[in-house]
Amino acid sequence: LIDDDVIAYMRTLTDAQKAAAAAVQEPNDGRYILSLGTQAYVFSYYPSSRISAWSTYDLGFEVSDYVAMDGKVYARAGDTIYLLGGDDGETYDAAPVVVETPYIDGRAVATWKRFTGWDVVSEGEWLVEVNTDPDRPDAWSKIGTLKDGTKATVAGLDLDMVGQSPLIKFKLTNARIGPAKLSKLIIHYTPEPSN
C-alpha cells in the first residue's frame, strides 16, 4: 500500500533527496501534499463519505519549496515556479488517472464469493480491470470501459466472468482529457457454500 510504495521509492533516492522533501497543506480542501524526489504523494480525506485516499503523481522534476497563498499552491523547482491547477484552479495536464482499490472482502474475508455485478457513480471514461488473486497482484482482467461523456451517471457491469474468490480489487484508468470522477463503487456478490 502507500507505505510500501513510499519506502520502495525512497530506496532509490540519495540521502540529500530524502532530506530535501517538501510538503504543504492545500488551503481550500485540506489535501496534504508531500514531494519526495520527482514524486508527489497527496492525501485526501472526505469526512462525510468517510473516504481517505493517497494519490501519487510523477512530476518529472524535484520540488524544493511549496507556498500556500491566497487559496493557491505554488511549487518551486530550480528557477521555475509552478501554480498547481493554473490561474483558474481547473487546469491540469493530460496525464492518465489510475485508481486502484485495496482488496475488498465484504467484511467476510474467509467467505468465497461469486461476484455478480457492481454499480458505480462516475464521470468521464474509465477502463475497468479487476484482480482476485493476492498471490498475483499485477494480474488484471479487463471487464469493460465506462463511457458516458462528461455527466455523472450510475452504471452497472456484469462481473460473472470473474468467477469465485474471497477478495476482489479494482483498477480504473482514465486517459482522456477533461473531468473525471469516481464517487461510489458498490460490489454485488453471493456467498458460495463452503466445502
Residue ranges and their predicted role:
Residues K113-F115, E125, L167:
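Core-facing hydrophobic residues within beta-strands of well-ordered domains
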Residues L1-T91:
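Beta-sheet-dominated scaffold domains
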Residues R50-Y57, D135-T145:
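Surface-exposed loop/edge segments in extracytoplasmic proteins
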Residues G117-V121:
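Short edge beta-strand/loop segments characteristic of extracellular beta-sandwich folds
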Residues R76-P96, K151, S165, L172-R176:
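Acidic, low-complexity/disordered segments
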Residues G89-K113:
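Short beta-strands within extracellular/lumenal beta-sheet-rich domains
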Residues G106-V109, W140-T190:
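Beta-sandwich interaction modules
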Residues W126-R136:
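Short, surface-exposed beta-strand/strand-loop-strand elements in extracellular ectodomains
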